[in-house]
Amino acid sequence: MSAKRSLKLDSVKKYNPVEASPLAKKKDLNSYSPTTGTCQISPFSSPTSHNAEDLRNGLSHGDETNSESRLSRRGQPQTAEDAFAELQSNVKSSLVRILKARENLTSLQALEGSRELENIIGVSDSSHILSAEVQKTQALMSQAEELQLLKRNHGQLPAREYAQPASSSAFLQLLLNSL
């Protein structure tokens, strides 16, 4: 007992994680490695700031700059045709979501019983019309591309060499000969 009194072990407060402040709790959790579950030996052994993790994981989370997203794979700037094709692809992919939203609005309209929602979304049975419009737009775009090709060839049909060959080796030969 005399040793206990000289070291004053009775007055030492034991650590209770429930009584810890939120900052101390966070600091206590941050000292453990998320992969191994072990405590860090040194606070300088690995980056604990969120900025370092963001820099490491930035591309995996899809954080790209606008300049990178506007460049094609080979680093070339995006042409107007490429931009339009991308927009057309986005319209095509969002068609299903648009139709679902329109369906939800028409069900709201039936519950509401007023004509205001019909004025917002247009004709109530136009879901098939919207998909038909997308198909018409694609057909018109292919016709416009054919017309541009005709203009480039001064009103003549495209030459036989521009037709797609049957085999890949013939296609590669055609490419090599055109250079």
Curated annotation (Swiss-Prot):
Its main location: nucleus. Residues 51-64 have a biased composition (Basic and acidic residues). Residues 30-50 have a biased composition (Polar residues). One of its GO terms (biological process) is cell division. It is found in: Nucleus; Chromosome, Centromere; Chromosome, Centromere, Kinetochore. InterPro entries: CENP-R. One of its GO terms (cellular component) is nucleoplasm. Residues 1-79 are annotated as: Disordered. A motif (LXXLL motif) lies at residues 172-176. The keyword Repressor applies. Keywords: Activator, Cell cycle, Cell division, Centromere, Chromosome, Kinetochore, Mitosis, Nucleus, Repressor, Transcription, Transcription regulation. PANTHER family: CENTROMERE PROTEIN R. Transcription coregulator that can have both coactivator and corepressor functions. Involved in the coactivation of nuclear receptors for retinoid X (RXRs) and thyroid hormone (TRs) in a ligand-dependent fashion. Probable component of a centromeric complex involved in assembly of kinetochore proteins, mitotic progression and chromosome segregation. Contains one Leu-Xaa-Xaa-Leu-Leu (LXXLL) motif, a motif known to be important for the association with nuclear receptors. This is Centromere protein R.
